């Protein structure tokens, strides 16, 4: 693993406790906030946001195991190292920020951040996949 990739991994590992904090926050809503239980849309989007944050953060770490093996320029490797973790921010942000009001009955405009996150994720994954396929065995 290159020093730059190792640094990215360290940053991502340091960020993982924020997802843990998010889970504790949702648990707190479930236990102490009766209004939270009255809004299934908010419950579902908060749950989706938390799940996407955790899964995409772990995926970002897994990807770092492969990125240095890809037959790509350093610029494209940077795209992978940055786009996939960025998706772990944009997708959950879309879910959380779109229903911040406890009485929300539909997602607000922030839900469109999900499309940005999806575009970043797909770009990063396709780039890595193509780079790995292009790699010739030694």
Short names for language-model regions:
Residues 1-36, 40-50, 54-138:
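Polytopic transmembrane helical bundles with strong interfacial aromatic enrichment
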